[in-house]
Amino acid sequence: MPHGLITIRRGRRTDLPALAPLLAFPPTHDTDKKHTQHWRRLVSDPAHDFYVAEQHGTLHGMVLVSYVRTLVHLGWLAILNIAVEPLAPGDISHRLIDFAKARARKRGCQRLVVYVSGSEPQMALTPLLEAGFLRMGEVLSCSLQGRP
């Protein structure tokens, strides 16, 4: 889905080397193999939507939306994971979040949640809060009902 100079496209297995610095992978051979296997499973799993933000051939961020059924919420619940390069153009975070919301709505989800550990810098949470997420302890939650 093009957005001016920024393109949001489905992630590929070959994107791992470019995105690994965003995920802070330790550089050991054993973990590289495990991360590669994990990555390939994520990219090919139909229970996930994995997309990257690309600008002029450079990957600046990624979003993974996982879909689960829960006892509390009727239907599906969408769980968001997002990572954006700190020096990426300012609107990439917002575009990835909006894109994730649209994908989750398309799958029939009524809520999108993000789990936070408390160690995230405030600037990493700011785009989520600006996008309508509300903090409840270690969870940021956003209703997908109403306006897109």
What feature does the model see in each segment?
Residues 113-124:
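Conserved beta-strand-loop-alpha-helix junction that forms the acyl-donor binding cleft
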